[in-house]
């Protein structure tokens, strides 16, 4: 691969990393808002099935990005993006905390109480979300490469979905458990929240599989990659 293509591959990697980090940080900032998504009118234990945090919306994109990076750039580069995303999340929390300590003036359109209620609501939840997410992403990457090696780079849909389904279940189950343990969510909502969150992520994962195929095809054509071949960046 010539230097021009290596530069292009590196630039695309940085863009994907930027999208990943932005999605991760945003999900940790917006998770307190709850929305409803009712493709099916289903009640479980008296609760509508798809009542979800808006923080769940960017998550499927992050798993699509790490799967794409895993496929094209390899496991090491995927791990680097995940670790960088965690540091970015921690840094964003530090910035928010520092901002909360600066008193708002009377003319400020946002007073201290409003600012703190939005950005400092349940810091334990943010911490739990980040730690759980880190765990789930590393599971996703390792399962993805296990299937990639086992199938010799074939059956992209298999490793994409198997890795995502497993890691998303771990993520959903663990975060809901921790939020209930911290007293942030009621215990009687455990089953509904786990099922709703996991099913939503599964549905989105199934829909993103064609996009993964498309992006992988574009990469292979642009960089003349064989099935299972990865771009090696320094």
Where are these regions (language model features)?
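N-terminal membrane topogenic signal
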Residues: 2-18
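Alpha-helical transmembrane segments of multi-pass membrane proteins
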Residues: 21-37
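Central hydrophobic cores of alpha-helical transmembrane segments in multi-pass inner-membrane proteins
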Residues: 57-68
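Transmembrane helix-bundle signature of multi-pass membrane transporters/permeases
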Residues: 85-86, 134, 157-169, 194-201
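Transmembrane alpha-helix/helix-exit interface in multi-pass inner-membrane proteins
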Residues: 89-108, 129, 133, 137
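Membrane-interface interhelical connector segments
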Residues: 98-124
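Membrane interface segments of multi-pass transport proteins and intramembrane proteases
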Residues: 147-160
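Short, highly charged, low-complexity non-transmembrane loops/tails of multi-pass membrane proteins
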Residues: 218-234
């Amino acid at each position: 691969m010539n230097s021009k293509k290596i530069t292009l591959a590196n630039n695309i990697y940085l863009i994907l990393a930027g999208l990943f980090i932005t999605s991760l940080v945003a999900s940790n900032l917006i998770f307190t808002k709850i929305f409803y998504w009712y493709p099916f009118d289903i009640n479980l234990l008296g609760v509508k099935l798809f009542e979800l945090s808006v923080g769940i919306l960017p998550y499927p994109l992050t798993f699509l990005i790490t799967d794409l990076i895993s496929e094209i750039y390899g496991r090491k580069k995927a791990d680097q993006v995940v670790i960088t995303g965690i540091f970015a999340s921690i840094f964003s929390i530090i910035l928010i905390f520092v901002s909360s300590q600066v008193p708002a003036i009377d003319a400020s359109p946002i007073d201290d109480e409003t600012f703190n209620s939005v950005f400092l609501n349940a810091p334990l939840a943010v911490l739990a979300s980040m730690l759980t997410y880190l765990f789930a992403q590393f599971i996703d990457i390792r399962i993805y490469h296990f299937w990639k090696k086992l199938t010799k780079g074939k059956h992209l849909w298999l490793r994409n979905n198997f890795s995502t389904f497993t890691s998303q279940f771990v993520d959903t189950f663990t975060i809901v458990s921790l939020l209930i343990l911290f007293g942030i969510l009621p215990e009687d909502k455990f089953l509904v929240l786990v099922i709703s969150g996991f099913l939503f992520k599964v549905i989105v994962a199934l829909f993103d599989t064609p996009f993964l195929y498309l992006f992988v095809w574009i990469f292979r054509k642009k960089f003349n990659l064989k099935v299972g071949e990865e771009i090696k960046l320094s």
